[in-house]
Curated annotation (Swiss-Prot):
Task performed by this protein: Redox regulated molecular chaperone. Protects both thermally unfolding and oxidatively damaged proteins from irreversible aggregation. Plays an important role in the bacterial defense system toward oxidative stress.
This protein's name: 33 kDa chaperonin
Any single GO CC term annotated in Swiss-Prot or TrEMBL for this entry: cytoplasm
Record's signal peptide: none
Record gene name: hslO
Protein family (similarity comment): Belongs to the HSP33 family.
Organism annotation: Shewanella piezotolerans (strain WP3 / JCM 13877)
Length: 286
């Protein structure tokens, strides 16, 4: 069974679209970067599944991020994705967290920010409160607020895998709420074990065996961190050289780490001189 794929499907007898996502390797790469508590691992898995599902709805080339913030023990959890289904993510927390901790106990009073950033065009940002019991319900509230389209989302994660389903009325003329409600009831019956162990085609057959479902070719999902030594060098260049020289004099090197993949980039005195020998904008030596 191939994991790390997103599947789109349509109903020939209803104006409703669906998506199904199954994650394993990409999910493991995200949670391997830090020693995350179990509850945060599962949260990041659900967030990855959600980001993949939402990315598939984009009508443009660009990025999407789902960011959760709050005043609880977890201050931040974010997953970034793009139209190529490349995902990365990170979380910040403080103290011990129970393995069965739920959304509101993790974030306290919090909110979710969904940011859409086209390669060409204006950025869009939507904000909803984390005042529901589950991430799925918060995302459904976001769609109700931003698109006014009936939407159903199911998310699952354990220590090894993550998965999710997305169901939404197509933005067409007419009232298709009755069709959606019927399919939503069927989708609600999906079990975590089914999404973790069965092929997408079998899952859809079990859920919608009396419907006319058209399943499209899968899209591969990968973990992709955009960090590099050059990007770290660019960050150093934004700091006054005197300040960097002071750190080098005291520590002998500058070490920069990536929160997303835990890579480390080390710069010594020679590296620093080379960084500042390049004009910030022109890329030519002075």
């Amino acid at each position: 069974m191939t994991k790390d794929n997103l599947y789109r499907y349509l109903f020939d007898n209803a104006s409703v679209r669906g998506e199904l996502v199954q994650l394993e390797k990409s999910y493991q790469e995200v949670i391997a970067a830090h020693d995350y508590p179990v509850a945060i691992q599962h949260l990041l898995g659900e967030l990855m599944a959600a980001t993949s599902l939402l990315t598939a709805t984009l009508k443009f080339s660009g990025d999407i991020s789902i960011q959760l913030q709050g005043d609880g023990p977890v201050s931040l959890a974010v997953i970034n994705g793009n139209n190529l289904q490349q995902l990365r993510g990170v979380s910040r927390w403080d103290g011990d967290i129970a393995a069965d901790a739920q959304l509101q106990s993790l974030f306290g009073k919090g909110h979710m920010v969904i940011t859409l950033t086209p390669d060409d065009g204006e950025r869009y940002q939507g904000v909803v409160a984390l005042d529901k019991e589950t991430l799925s319900e918060c995302l459904e509230a976001y769609f109700e607020q931003s698109e006014q389209l009936p939407t159903k989302i199911k998310l699952f994660a354990d220590a090894k895998q993550a998965a999710g389903m997305f169901l939404q009325v197509l933005p067409t003329d007419g009232n298709h709420n009755e069709e959606f409600e019927h399919l939503s009831v069927l989708t609600e019956t999906v079990k975590q074990e089914e999404l973790f162990t069965l092929e997408a085609e079998e899952v859809l057959h079990r859920l919608y065996h009396e419907e006319e479902v058209r399943l499209f070719e899968p899209v591969a999902i990968t973990f992709n961190c955009t960090c590099s030594k050059e990007r770290s060098a660019q960050a150093i260049r934004t700091v006054a050289k005197e300040e960097i020289d002071s750190i080098i004099a005291e520590q002998g090197k500058i070490e920069m780490g990536c929160e997303y993949c835990n890579s480390k980039y080390v710069f010594d005195a020679i590296d620093v001189e080379a960084i500042y020998a390049v004009a910030p904008n022109s890329g030519t030596t002075q």
